[in-house]
Amino acid sequence: MSAFSPGSHNSQVSATPKEQSHVSSYQQQHPANVRALRVFRSILSSSFGPSGFLKMIQNQSGGHLTLTSSSQRLLQSISLSKPILKLIAAAVEGHLKIWSDGGLYTALLTCALIEECWESGLHPVLCVSVNEIVRDLCLQTLNRQDGLRIPIDLASMDAMLSLVKPVIGSKPGCGMDTGQVTFISSLVMQAFVSSIPSPNSQQVLTLPQVQIIGVESWPVSGSHFVLGVLMAAPDIPPSFKRDVRTPGVHTGPDGGCIRVALYDISLAGDSEEFIDVRYELSPELHAEDATLAAMKDLVDHLVAHGVGLVACQRVIHPSVKGYLRARGVQALDRLSLLHIREVQRITDAEILSSLDTNVPASSLGHLTDIRQHVMFKKSYLHLINTASPQCCLVLCHYTEQALEELKHVCQVALHTLTLALKDPWALPGAGCLEFILAHCIRRQVRELGDSLWQDIGCTKAQFLRLAETFATCLEAVAMAINKRGEQHITDVASHHRWLLPSDGVEDTAWLQGKGRCACGLKTAEEHAEEREWNLVGGVQGGAQRGGIKENGAHLQKSKTEGDRYDPSSPVSNSHKKTVNKKAKDSSKSDKCTEILMPGNGGDICGTMDADSGNSTASLSGKNLILDSFAVKCNAFRVAVETANMVLRIGHTIEDIN
């Protein structure tokens, strides 16, 4: 036997012993997990809202720098080590893939529920059961026809802007003031509307698609939109002033149109079509020359069929480009997977994957015109098709990071508008919805039957305590929107969220100065004589609020009967101070519409003024902040389900090998 054979004792090949696995197991409420969750929540909370702080992310070894407060870009850029954080991030990213918006809200509510349930000291399974009950109550409230849902008139510019402006204005990384936010929001609206097919056209109705091009080192005011699709044409100098001439079809049903051939294979002579082909060449022939000759035959065939544009996802050989231009045919290459879809949408061409010269006419696309478009000292080919309402949104900004953030929020805003076509409903934004839901939870859970908490194996006090925890988490997410030291108050008539300046304690006219609530649907003057004001979360900085006089009336702190829990409950309402303006007049209660919880007749979860209800007409001329109904409901579901999933986990087991 050979000395080097596997069976020899003298073999020089020795097996490396497998390193023994190290399995560690720790409870989910391990201090390391709690610290990681708090840090993660702090990062997200400080990024939330228009006054949030930007996060600068870079790999320790260098590389690309990301400056953002967007959840999607944030989660894509950071690396998480704790399994619990990976689970939360995966749930948020799954929500964003479908809905695009609401990532920070989902993550914050998830983290708040997990942390508060851990701190409650109650069994996690009990927390999960109560969370599911409260979740169902909230969803029933949201889905009521006469409840919180606000109908969106798709023909109203003000109503649609109420959905767009909060998305664009919520990201400070865009570096825009109020006027610029309004300007960009209007551009997004115009581009979206221009991309909707006409109902009188023969074209199949599809979701609007808007191309977005970013231009760096130019002011935001240079942003605009162009009908059609723009494709970069670096081969055409910007100083070229002549019209782009392309052959067209002069007769037949396609008369006056420019035909387009669209390829997703290389036209540089290295097509994958010939990889497995075996061939023999005569000494005087070369494979590259033969391939180029075949492609030129293909060009002659396309020109004979009236093709004026050849677009390729990959590379077109320079000699083939010259051959095309000599015959008046424009060439576009290196389109990438993204741009080839845009060309396909506007031309309605079939993507060709072969160099076969027998190209059927039905596989060719059509354009109305091709023009040169010089924009910011760069040349583009402007593809126009009057039968296909495609639109290009050109966004400008001074810096690369601000431009990337602006492009991202505009894509999210366009997706939000697309969702509004299918589900034209909205919800109060800017934290008002969370305050209303928190009030509904506190009022409704006290009216539930005793059998409910008996079935889940807890006392009434424990049930009310966990319901209060859920309501507090909703309020905490809402209060994370503003970070300038304002106090948060709510009125007992509509339960919307209002902001009180930090120096409002000494301001005797603070009630008149508030104007509208955070979302803009309610004003301080509506039924002013009936309002009671609750200070939510206490006064910041340790200050105490004394009596405040307004119009001669002395306003004292107290606690409303509606916000007081059952005496048997260990939960105190010390976090909420009440400023009573005037006792409510029961004779005027018929002016309000009661929002009732389904299945529990007579239980008021809030009140909506009938004169200023959630009607489409009431949205006109108001600077409102609204959230998409579909996005917010799904974000709420994902947050609660993810929190419950984490609470169900008993141990984390890590196998390190």
What residues fall within each predicted segment?
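N-terminal switch/interaction subdomains of large nucleotide-dependent motors and GTPases
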Residues: S2, P6, K18, Q29-N33, ...
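Long, structured protein-protein interaction/assembly regions in large complexes
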Residues: S2-G7, V134-L427, G541-G542, I649-N657
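Extended, low-charge hydrophobic alpha-helical regions
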Residues: P31, T399-N657
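Short, hydrophobic/aliphatic alpha-helical segments
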Residues: A32-R41, S81-K97, L298, H408-W425
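Glycine-rich oxoanion-binding loops at beta->alpha junctions
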Residues: G62-G94, V277-L292, K296, D300
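Elongated alpha-helical scaffolds
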Residues: P83-C117
